[in-house]
């Protein structure tokens, strides 16, 4: 074993240097944690142009977990193993040391299932589908995640690791083309000459592996596998959550990660060796926990393989590392630290700036290649400007190979500490500018957020604009004049049915999920009710506009602040801002500097960084240069959140000379009186408080910014007081699941809206399970969290149930400590318990729902919710948002009484929360919650009864339309009619084209929202790209939509065709006399005017040209 010394920060540079010098040699760089492995992998592509550098990720689950790892991680591991075994060139692998203990499939496994496709190769859809299933791909209706594929007609869509999505078009028995497509838009982006497909999992289920599993399972665990869903799933060829923990049972033998390379040299340090020993100890602990849990329950279907069966031993791996060719590295930083440290150690009394000293260092090392590394684009631009000010030239680089001598090289390079070698001097901007150095998030921004709300399920209540509340039963096809046509079947009172043609689907709006009385078809009651509501909406709209106008009339002095000091404040933020955060911050900055009062809503999912955005606003106002003693008030709904915000603000604003206080029930009355006096005199710059801040005895000296966190938690009287402040102060409201009232205000343009939909770096979705109360699973969940160094929440909605839960926890997890918090305790006692939980002084916090708002403890990542069916949807979502807020996977267990039969609405709530696991689900949750509980009021004086009259969607549409009319905007008012088009053509989306009925309804809904011909054509292009060439019936539908748009412009209520021409009936109130007379005059031989606003146009028609003829007729009418 060789030993070498170099700076710790140069670890990747050193590994690349060795790799480059030994062209025929494989290397493994082993590090002591997963985060460092990923960081070094990203650095490697700057230090080397060699493409044969790989990263093997760790699972995001713990040993003996009964949930499966993230599919992206599973597929990335499989992809890496495939490349290692199929690439004959020398390779460098970077990985977490613990992965060296993993038992993996035999090394020839991935080469057996390696598949290369290219255009014109002979392959049928069925053949490829079978191979994909064998390669662990899952067949779904649509492809959205890594490892999924879908079949639609002559097209297969497949998602590979990356993720990268490909569309394979077939023509009979060969592949016609392969295209890459965008997962979010489903639109293809470029053609590919070949496509390499390998297994997306380390386990494939075929006759051989399933046979091995059966035999090995029998040998290890005996025959007692009756009613075991894991065993039954696997022998049936289906995946099962957590079956990865039984991997060795599927193969005759296993290989190690080292076996996948050709006699590699391992580069490691003593920390890596220590990590291997600690991982083995953890595995042993988890094994004991799982074994003990299994003993408590007969036929537990997660049998535990011994650590020796599941992993290689630490002693064997350590012995392998210590072989003669491997390299043990140690670190010497003292000399380098003093050299680089001297740059940034400029004292206050020195005349030289930090950059004067930097350029002295550069001048002394100009014989070397000097590289200044910036972590982000903003610092890169600042460094460029500084270099130019010092009259040096610079060279922008992306790779180390591009670096030149006698010039300063700069680039965006993920390096966090300076170091030097004989040939190079690396200096990081993070040390020069005191900024953070992290890695930008590669997660794509969530697309079409509000479009995801546009679901309509069979059995849901709906509202027809003309006929009122009904129940959507299903899509149904009818034959009309020998042609099939899709209709929405709506049930009304008295078992009456209404059939709405799909091209008129926009007349149908979702009502919600409350049980309601159905309207009667043909009754005048609906029209009377709608007309009355329209008058009330007009009043509300006028009031809303007056509020907005009154605010705009209040001129505000544009906020000015010190940009250099602001940059320093921003640099103290320990994370990279997401794209959406930066956009929201820029929106706020524009609001504060434009001379008008700000009224903005920040909608961002739980844990997506709304608080940091608010803090930027606070800084801009509190440090305003042109205001005398400006003040900021932050109003929060709970004492716990107030205390947390106060602590965070104190830490974040440290060193900026701002006086920050909190006012809530934890503050003594004596201290509260002092705070009130200091607020009135202007001595306090930032006050954070609960509803106490909204009391009439609170006087501000110069309140310039009001921040409202989770506004929906405040009562009506408190909201009225908040409104009185809005006329003189800037207002910023924040919400994770925006209540419809607030969201409606934003969508109607009366309140500015910023959406934060991009998750932070490395954020993982919370795994959510709905299950009967089970002490074994609860014990296992709590112990697993404890063993990975974390803490757990145990939420009990009712205080009276806490004693029982406490007794049960004493029995099932006696080794864990806990404390209780609930609303009947004194605020000071709650504060004391929460402080201890923050500090990690006990393992489990048993609490009521008082923790639902804003609690942020990154070490607490397991939550059990007792009797979850008794909580509302937004409550469940907010509670779940307390976990998984860092880089650690969160686990939420929603328990219900095992013998309890759930009501339909309770069951639906739990289904929604379980299925809404994706990051950024808050908007979907808000919509579902509105469906389940109805909307709140808009301006305080009216509750949700009005909305129940017509349903949420129609109410929103009516409100938007009325506000637009009152604001005199160029938006067409509600059409008093819907054109009915009957051209005797088949109009529907065939099952062979889109087989999933829910997707088909969603597409029909989207079609109903198309507002012009360009949108129709774009939609058509998207359909062709996603599903293949349009069937004639679908094409007819889109053509009829375009004709319908023309009918709107011409006030045509009916357009019918027959063998001898068209019959047009104009809307009764439309004045079309001039156009009709001109048209009749021009085409007197082909036209007839009939009573009831009808126009007959005579022309022999056939199916193939009927669309063309109809278009020609309407365009002629339009242009005449």
Curated annotation (Swiss-Prot):
Compartments reported by the entry: Cytoplasm
A GO molecular-function annotation: DNA helicase activity
InterPro entries: CarD-like/TRCF_RID, CarD-like/TRCF_RID_sf, DEAD/DEAH_box_helicase_dom, Helicase_ATP-bd, Helicase_C-like, Mfd, P-loop_NTPase, RecG/Mfd
Keyword terms: ATP-binding, Cytoplasm, DNA damage, DNA repair, DNA-binding, Helicase, Hydrolase, Nucleotide-binding
Residues where ATP binds: 604-611
Top EC class, one word: hydrolase
Residues spanned by motif DEEQ box: 709-712
EC number: 3.6.4.-
SUPFAM superfamilies cross-referenced by the UniProt entry: CarD-like, P-loop containing nucleoside triphosphate hydrolases, TRCF domain-like
Ranges of residues in domain Helicase C-terminal: 777-933
Entry GO CC: cytoplasm
Domain Helicase ATP-binding: 591-756
Major location category of this protein: cytoplasm
Gene3D superfamilies listed in its UniProt record: 2.40.10.170, 3.40.50.11140, 3.40.50.11180, P-loop containing nucleotide triphosphate hydrolases (3.40.50.300), Penicillin-binding protein 1b domain (3.30.2060.10), Transcription-repair-coupling factor, D7 domain (3.90.1150.50)
PROSITE patterns membership: HELICASE_ATP_BIND_1, HELICASE_CTER
Swiss-Prot/TrEMBL GO biological process terms: regulation of DNA-templated transcription; transcription-coupled nucleotide-excision repair, DNA damage recognition
Family: In the N-terminal section; belongs to the UvrB family. In the C-terminal section; belongs to the helicase family. RecG subfamily.
HAMAP family per UniProt: TRCF
Biological function: Couples transcription and DNA repair by recognizing RNA polymerase (RNAP) stalled at DNA lesions. Mediates ATP-dependent release of RNAP and its truncated transcript from the DNA, and recruitment of nucleotide excision repair machinery to the damaged site.
Protein name per Swiss-Prot or TrEMBL: Transcription-repair-coupling factor
High-level lineage: Bacteria, Pseudomonadati, Pseudomonadota, Alphaproteobacteria, Rickettsiales
Gene (UniProt): mfd
């Amino acid at each position: 074993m060789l030993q070498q010394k170099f700076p710790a920060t140069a670890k990747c540079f050193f590994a690349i240097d060795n790799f480059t010098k030994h062209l025929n040699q494989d290397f493994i760089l082993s590090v002591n944690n997963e985060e460092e492995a990923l960081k070094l992998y990203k650095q490697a592509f700057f230090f080397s142009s060699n493409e044969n550098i790989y990263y093997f990720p760790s699972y995001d689950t713990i040993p003996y977990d009964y949930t499966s790892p993230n599919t992206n991680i599973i597929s990335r591991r499989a992809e890496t193993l495939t490349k290692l075994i199929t690439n004959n060139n020398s390779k460098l692998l970077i990985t977490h040391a613990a992965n060296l203990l993993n038992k993996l499939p035999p090394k020839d496994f991935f080469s057996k299932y390696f598949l290369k496709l290219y255009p014109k190769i002979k392959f049928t859809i069925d053949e490829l589908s079978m191979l994909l299933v064998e390669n662990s791909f899952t067949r779904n209706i649509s492809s959205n995640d890594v490892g999924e594929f879908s079949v639609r007609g002559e097209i297969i869509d497949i998602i590979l690791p990356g993720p990268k999505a490909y569309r394979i078009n077939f023509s009979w028995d060969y592949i016609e083309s392969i295209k890459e497509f965008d997962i979010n838009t489903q639109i293809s982006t470029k053609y590919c000459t070949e496509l390499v497909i390998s297994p997306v999992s380390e386990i494939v289920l075929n006759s051989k592996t399933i046979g091995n599993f059966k035999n090995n399972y029998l040998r290890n665990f005996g025959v007692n596998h009756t009613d075991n869903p894991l065993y039954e799933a696997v022998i049936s060829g289906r995946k099962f959550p957590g079956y990865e923990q039984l991997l060795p049972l599927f193969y005759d033998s296993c290989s190690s990660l080292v076996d996948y390379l050709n006699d590699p040299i391992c580069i490691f340090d003593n920390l890596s060796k220590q990590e291997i020993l600690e991982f083995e100890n953890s595995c042993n602990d988890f094994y004991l926990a799982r074994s003990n849990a299994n003993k408590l329950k007969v036929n537990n279907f997660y049998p535990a393989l011994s650590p020796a069966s599941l992993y290689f031993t630490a002693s064997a791996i350590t012995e392998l590392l210590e072989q003669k060719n491997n390299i043990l590295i140690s670190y010497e930083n003292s000399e380098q630290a003093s050299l680089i440290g001297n740059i940034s150690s400029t004292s206050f009394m020195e005349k030289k700036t930090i950059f004067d000293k930097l350029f002295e260092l550069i001048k002394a090392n100009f014989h070397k290649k000097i590289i200044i590394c910036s972590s982000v684009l903003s610092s890169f631009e600042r460094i460029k400007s500084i270099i130019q000010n010092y009259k040096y030239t610079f060279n922008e680089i992306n790779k180390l190979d591009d670096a030149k001598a006698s010039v300063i090289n700069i680039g965006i390079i993920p390096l966090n500490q300076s170091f030097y070698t004989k040939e190079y001097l690396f200096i990081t901007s993070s040390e020069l500018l005191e900024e953070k150095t992290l890695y930008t998030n590669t997660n794509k921004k969530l697309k079409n957020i509000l479009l995801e709300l546009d679901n309509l399920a069979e059995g849901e209540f709906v509202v027809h604009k003309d006929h009122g509340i009904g129940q959507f039963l299903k899509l149904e096809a009818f034959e009309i004049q020998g042609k099939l046509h899709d209709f929405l079947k709506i049930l009304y009172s008295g078992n009456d049915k209404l059939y709405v043609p799909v091209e008129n689907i926009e007349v149908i709006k979702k009502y919600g999920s409350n049980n309601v009385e159905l309207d009667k078809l043909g009754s005048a009651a609906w029209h009377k009710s709608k007309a009355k509501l329209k008058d009330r909406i007009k009043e509300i709209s006028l009031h809303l506009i007056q509020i907005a106008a009154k605010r705009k009339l209040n001129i505000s002095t544009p906020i000015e602040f010190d940009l250099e000091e602001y940059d320093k404040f921003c640099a103290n933020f320990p994370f990279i801002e997401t794209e959406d955060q930066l956009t929201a911050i820029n929106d706020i900055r524009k609001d504060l500097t434009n001379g008008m009062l700000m009224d903005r809503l920040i909608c961002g999912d739980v844990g997506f960084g709304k608080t940091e955005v608010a803090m930027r606003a606070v800084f801009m106002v509190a440090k305003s240069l042109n205001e005398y003693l400006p003040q900021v008030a932050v109003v929060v709904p709970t004492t716990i959140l107030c205390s947390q915000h106060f602590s965070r603000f104190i830490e974040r604003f440290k060193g900026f000379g701002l006086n920050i206080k909190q006012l809530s029930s934890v503050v003594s009355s004596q201290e509260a009186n002092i705070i009130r006096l200091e607020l009135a005199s202007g001595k306090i710059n930032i006050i954070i408080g609960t509803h106490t801040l909204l009391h009439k005895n609170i006087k501000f000296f110069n309140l310039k910014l009001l921040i409202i966190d989770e506004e929906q938690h405040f009562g009506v009287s408190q909201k009225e007081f908040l409104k009185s402040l809005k006329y003189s102060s800037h207002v910023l409201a924040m919400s994770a699941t925006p209540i419809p009232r607030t969201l409606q205000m934003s969508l109607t343009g009366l309140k500015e809206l910023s959406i934060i939909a991009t998750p932070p770096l490395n954020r993982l979705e919370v795994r959510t399970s709905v299950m009967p109360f089970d002490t074994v699973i609860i014990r296992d969940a709590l112990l697993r969290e404890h063993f990975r160094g974390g803490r757990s929440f145990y939420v009990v909605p009712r205080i009276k149930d806490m004693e029982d839960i406490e007794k049960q926890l004493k029995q099932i997890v006696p080794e864990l400590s806990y404390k209780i918090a609930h609303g009947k305790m004194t605020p000071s006692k709650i504060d004391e318990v929460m402080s201890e939980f923050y500090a990690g002084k006990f393992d489990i916090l048993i609490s009521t729902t008082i923790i639902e708002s804003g609690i942020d403890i990154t070490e607490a990542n397991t939550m059990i919710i007792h009797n979850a069916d008794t909580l509302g949807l937004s409550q469940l979502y907010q509670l779940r948002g307390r976990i998984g807020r860092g880089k650690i996977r969160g686990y939420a267990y929603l328990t219900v009484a095992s013998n309890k039969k759930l009501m339909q609405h309770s069951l639906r709530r739990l289904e929604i929360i379980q299925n809404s696991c994706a990051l950024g689900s808050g908007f979907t949750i808000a919509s579902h919650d509105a469906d389940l509980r109805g909307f709140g009021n808009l301006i305080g004086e009216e509750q949700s009864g009005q909305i129940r009259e017509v349903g949420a969607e129609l109410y929103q549409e009516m409100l938007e339309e009325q506000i637009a009319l009152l604001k005199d905007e160029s938006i067409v008012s509600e059409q008093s009619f819907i054109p009915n088009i009957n051209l005797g053509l088949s109009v529907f989306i065939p099952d062979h084209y889109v087989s999933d009925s829910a997707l088909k309804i969603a597409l029909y809904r989207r079609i109903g929202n198309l507002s012009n011909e360009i949108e129709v054509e774009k939609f058509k292009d998207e359909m062709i790209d996603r599903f293949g060439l349009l069937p004639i019936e679908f094409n007819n539908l889109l053509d009829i939509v375009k004709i319908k748009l023309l009918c709107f412009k011409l006030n045509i209520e009916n357009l019918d065709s027959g063998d001898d021409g068209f019959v047009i009936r104009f809307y009764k109130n439309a004045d079309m006399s001039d156009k009709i007379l001109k048209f009749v005059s021009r085409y007197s031989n082909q036209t007839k005017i009939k009573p009831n606003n009808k126009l007959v146009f005579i022309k022999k028609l056939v199916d193939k040209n009927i669309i063309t003829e109809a278009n020609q007729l309407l365009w002629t009418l339009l242009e005449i």
